């Protein structure tokens, strides 16, 4: 259908539209008109992706000079594929309506691991190995040697792409990862470099967060993207953690021991080259005097190690004299390494700021701040000069150089914590240095400054006003949308007591209480008897899940549960979890029914949708607070309090509730889907917790369902499931939660749509 969204003609590839989709597009258009940033919370399963794509594509076509590109960031590869398929549908609809092929290019970009087609590289399992092997086949000096001696290993796909792929742009169309690989095989071109080259002239690029937020990768991949682009971060409820991880470095004793080995290898290589080809080192010295910008204007294939920080002015300066020659630089790194090793010999926890660390460094081993800032770039230049092919081996030293560059660049927003042992094993000496970023806005600031509109969107962003604070930006629109339903298909409830009236909670004091554990077991047992097909249960941590399940086993509860449904458990091993998921789905398909026990913040809670019968009930055992004794977390809470005036308790509750909402939101993946959302902890009923749930869940959480016993909860569930078992046809939805074009244009409907969005 063709829609008029505030004067913009939007092609929408379906015959019917949800009212909230129309409302969402309106808010989106206002954001683009204002050339500002937006925070939008849209219920899960209501067609967020297609609304985003339809509106932004229409905007691109109406104002081609205002918005030149859409950069769509998603978290996992399956999500990226989903976005590309929606885009394909949309483009087909455009072409059908206009009767001609459009000069439109949309493509997905992922790591070499997902795109490489070289027969020697594809069997490798880990991304780091794939990148290293690829580099050893495509580095500029490897290719130069190949020109003289064709028997040397090389990558024919990259050679072919380099020779012919750049002149011929990708034909218009939509390409997912498999399409790129198929094209690569047909033409003999490397799909990874083809995709990286093509994102410059694509209309839509879909890739993972790290390509924009991790400065080491963004510098290589996203540097050339135009300012007049719209950036969308989908499923962005965790975006602050992604920012923080991309800027943090952990150094263990093992890493430092391997650095030692790396330095010795480099020392030998430098001596060997000095004897055979001293000119090469002299050339490098000359380049470094001219400035790093020249040194790093090398080939794209060598840029495997990027700069971990953002300031470009470092690259314009000449490298300090003390680290220009290779030997001096290696000596410099050795002194730095010795100092960090010495700092790890601690008996108690040390916490200090980067300036304090630097002053200690200057006093002990006379290393000044300025040369440290050049460490990462200088190492990159050295590895290039020495023609090191297997870069994966040098990752420990690269990590140390990244740490040096970061610690000397940022004076605030970071903290250094040195722990002599892991809290869980206090008897084993296992020292670790955390260089921890506490300010999420550091990594995302360049994105907000560079692109004219950035949209942060997800199903669980409540409370909305905390995101602009912790990411330090000023949105022009902030809105949360309700879910218009012809039948109420979600049933949230809070179970706060067992049948014996014992309050149930996962808080630390009552965690080991046998009565609480028994009541949790009874809840799962009774729910497994009334809920059809699949139940997903989330615990607050792996440790808590293991101890609870062990107690259930001793009490004989597990045996009773297994009479009703089969049990599957998520573990920390990715492969095991995948098998458990597969079998869980099989049991649901066969009608045997299954229960999946998993963990909030784990793999299952983040990226897996339990559509229809795969998730008829989600039970959240306890409030998923993060481990509050962690020193890194304490430092971050202190920083948030001082910098952004966010109280510690507010942030912890916000963090726990966004994860709880993320877990229970897995059950509802569309309006024809239905499911129970059981919050099993008396603390959920408090105003500060309940008020932080997304609006679309809060609306259906009635006062009657606030502090139920297990039996009362089961009665509510039975009643709800009986309602849901009645036949439900598309006709029942029409006019209410599904609108045709005529219905959408009626005044009454437009008035109703006004109320869906709640601006903040």
UniProtKB/Swiss-Prot annotation:
Q: Where in the cell is it found?
A: Nucleus; Cytoplasm, Cytoskeleton, Spindle
The alphabetized list of GO BP terms reads: apoptotic process; bone mineralization; central nervous system myelin formation; chromosome segregation; determination of adult lifespan; embryonic cleavage; embryonic organ development; erythrocyte maturation
Q: Which cofactor does it need?
A: Mg(2+); [4Fe-4S] cluster
What changing residue 675 to R does, per the record, is: In XP-D/CS; severe form
Q: Where does ATP bind?
A: 42-49
How does acidity or alkalinity (pH) affect activity?
Optimum pH is 6.5 for both helicase and DNA-stimulated ATPase activity.
Q: What is its EC number?
A: 5.6.2.3
| Annotated phenotype, changing residue 112 to H | In TTD1 and XP-D
Q: Which GO terms describe its molecular function?
A: 4 iron, 4 sulfur cluster binding; 5'-3' DNA helicase activity; ATP binding; ATP hydrolysis activity; damaged DNA binding; DNA helicase activity; metal ion binding; protein-macromolecule adaptor activity
Q: What's in the keyword line of the UniProt record?
A: 4Fe-4S, ATP-binding, Cataract, Chromosome partition, Cockayne syndrome, Cytoplasm, Cytoskeleton, Deafness, Disease variant, DNA damage, DNA repair, DNA-binding, Dwarfism, Helicase, Host-virus interaction, Hydrolase, Ichthyosis, Iron, Iron-sulfur, Isomerase, Magnesium, Metal-binding, Nucleotide-binding, Nucleus, Transcription, Transcription regulation, Ubl conjugation, Xeroderma pigmentosum
Please tell me, according to the UniProt entry, what happens when changing residue 190 to S. Reduced iron-sulfur-binding. Iron-sulfur-binding is further decreased in absence of MMS19
User: What ranges does the record give for the region Mediates interaction with MMS19, renumbered to this chain?
Assistant: 438-637
SUPFAM superfamilies from the xrefs?
A: P-loop containing nucleoside triphosphate hydrolases
Q: Which disease is it linked to?
A: Xeroderma pigmentosum complementation group D: An autosomal recessive pigmentary skin disorder characterized by solar hypersensitivity of the skin, high predisposition for developing cancers on areas exposed to sunlight and, in some cases, neurological abnormalities. The skin develops marked freckling and other pigmentation abnormalities. Some XP-D patients present features of Cockayne syndrome, including cachectic dwarfism, pigmentary retinopathy, ataxia, decreased nerve conduction velocities. Trichothiodystrophy 1, photosensitive: A form of trichothiodystrophy, an autosomal recessive disease characterized by sulfur-deficient brittle hair and multisystem variable abnormalities. The spectrum of clinical features varies from mild disease with only hair involvement to severe disease with cutaneous, neurologic and profound developmental defects. Ichthyosis, intellectual and developmental disabilities, decreased fertility, abnormal characteristics at birth, ocular abnormalities, short stature, and infections are common manifestations.
PANTHER family named among the record's database cross-references: DNA REPAIR DEAD HELICASE RAD3/XP-D SUBFAMILY MEMBER (PTHR11472), GENERAL TRANSCRIPTION AND DNA REPAIR FACTOR IIH HELICASE SUBUNIT XPD (PTHR11472:SF1)
* Family named by the database record: Belongs to the helicase family. RAD3/XPD subfamily.
UniProt function note? ATP-dependent 5'-3' DNA helicase. Component of the general transcription and DNA repair factor IIH (TFIIH) core complex, not absolutely essential for minimal transcription in vitro. Required for transcription-coupled nucleotide excision repair (NER) of damaged DNA; recognizes damaged bases. Sequestered in chromatin on UV-damaged DNA. When complexed to CDK-activating kinase (CAK), involved in transcription by RNA polymerase II. In NER, TFIIH acts by opening DNA around the lesion to allow the excision of the damaged oligonucleotide and its replacement by a new DNA fragment.
Q: What is this protein called?
A: General transcription and DNA repair factor IIH helicase subunit XPD
Per the UniProt record, the source organism is Homo sapiens (Human)
């Amino acid at each position: 259908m063709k829609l008029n969204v505030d004067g913009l003609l939007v092609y929408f590839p379906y015959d019917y539209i949800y009212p909230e989709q129309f409302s969402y597009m309106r808010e989106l258009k206002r954001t683009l008109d204002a050339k500002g940033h937006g925070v939008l919370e849209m219920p899960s399963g209501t067609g967020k992706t297609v609304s985003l794509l339809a509106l932004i594509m229409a905007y691109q076509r109406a104002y081609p000079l205002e918005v030149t590109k859409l950069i769509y960031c998603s978290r996992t590869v399956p999500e990226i594929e989903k976005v590309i398929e929606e885009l394909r549908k949309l483009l087909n609809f455009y072409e059908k309506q206009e009767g001609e092929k459009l000069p439109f290019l949309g493509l997905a970009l992922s790591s070499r691991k997902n795109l490489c087609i070289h027969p020697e590289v594809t069997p490798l399992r880990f991304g780091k190995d794939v990148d290293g092997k690829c580099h050893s086949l495509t580095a500029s000096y490897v290719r130069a040697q190949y020109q003289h001696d064709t028997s040397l290993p090389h990558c024919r796909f990259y050679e072919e792409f380099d020779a012919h792929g750049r002149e011929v742009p990708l034909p218009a169309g939509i390409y997912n990862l498999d399409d790129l690989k198929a094209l690569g095989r047909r033409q003999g071109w490397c799909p990874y470099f083809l995709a990286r080259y093509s994102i410059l002239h694509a209309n839509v690029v879909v890739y993972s967060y790290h390509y924009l937020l991790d400065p080491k990768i963004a510098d290589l991949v996203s540097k050339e993207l135009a300012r007049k682009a719209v950036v969308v971060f989908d499923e962005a409820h965790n975006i602050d953690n992604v920012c923080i991880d991309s800027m943090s470095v952990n150094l263990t004793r093992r890493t430092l021991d391997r650095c030692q080995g790396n330095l010795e290898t480099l020392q030998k290589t430098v001596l060997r080259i000095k004897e055979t080809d001293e000119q090469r080192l002299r050339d490098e010295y000359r380049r470094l005097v001219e400035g790093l910008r020249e040194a790093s204007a090398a080939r794209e294939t060598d840029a495997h190690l990027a700069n971990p920080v953002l300031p470009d002015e470092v690259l314009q300066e000449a490298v300090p004299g003390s680290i220009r020659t290779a030997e001096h630089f290696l000596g410099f790194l050795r002194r730095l390494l010795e100092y960090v090793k010495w700092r790890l010999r601690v008996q108690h926890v040390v916490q200090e700021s980067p300036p304090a660390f630097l002053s200690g460094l200057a006093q002990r081993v006379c290393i000044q701040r300025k040369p440290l800032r050049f460490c990462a770039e200088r190492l990159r230049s050295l590895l290039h000069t020495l023609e090191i092919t297997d870069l994966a081996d040098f990752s420990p030293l690269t990590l140390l150089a990244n740490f040096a560059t970061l610690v000397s660049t940022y004076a605030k927003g970071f903290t250094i914590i040195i722990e002599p042992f892991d809290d869980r094993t206090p008897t084993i000496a296992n020292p670790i240095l955390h260089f921890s970023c506490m300010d999420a806005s550091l990594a995302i600031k360049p994105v907000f400054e560079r692109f004219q509109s950035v949209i942060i969107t997800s199903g669980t962003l409540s409370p909305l006003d905390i995101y602009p604070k912790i990411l330090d930006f000023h949105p022009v629109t902030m809105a949360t949308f309700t879910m218009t339903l012809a039948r109420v298909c979600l049933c949230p409830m809070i179970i706060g007591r067992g049948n014996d009236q014992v309050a149930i909670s996962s808080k630390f004091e009552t965690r080991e209480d046998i009565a609480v554990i028994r009541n949790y077991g009874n809840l799962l047992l009774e729910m497994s008897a009334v809920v059809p097909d699949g139940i997903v249960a989330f615990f607050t941590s792996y440790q808590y899940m293991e101890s609870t399940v062990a107690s259930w086993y001793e009490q004989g509860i597990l045996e009773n549960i297994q009479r009703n449904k089969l049990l599957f458990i998520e573990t920390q091993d990715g492969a095991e979890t995948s098998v458990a998921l597969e079998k869980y789905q099989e049991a649901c398909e066969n009608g045997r029914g299954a229960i999946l026990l998993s963990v909030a913040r784990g793999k299952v809670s983040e990226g897996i949708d339990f559509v229809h019968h795969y998730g008829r009930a989600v039970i959240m055992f306890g409030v998923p607070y993060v481990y509050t004794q962690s020193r890194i977390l304490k430092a971050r809470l202190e920083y948030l309090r001082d910098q952004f005036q966010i109280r510690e308790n507010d942030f912890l509750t916000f963090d726990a509730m966004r994860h709880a909402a993320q877990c229970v939101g897995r059950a509802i993946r569309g309006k024809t889907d239905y499911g129970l959302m059981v919050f099993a902890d008396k603390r959920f009923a408090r105003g500060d917790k309940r008020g932080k749930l997304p609006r679309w869940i809060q609306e259906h959480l009635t006062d009657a369902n606030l502090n139920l016993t297990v039996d009362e909860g089961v009665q509510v569930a039975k009643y709800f499931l009986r309602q849901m078992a009645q036949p439900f046809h598309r006709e029942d939805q029409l006019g209410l939660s599904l609108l045709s074009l005529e219905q959408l244009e009626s005044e009454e409907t437009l008035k109703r749509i006004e109320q869906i969005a709640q601006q903040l």
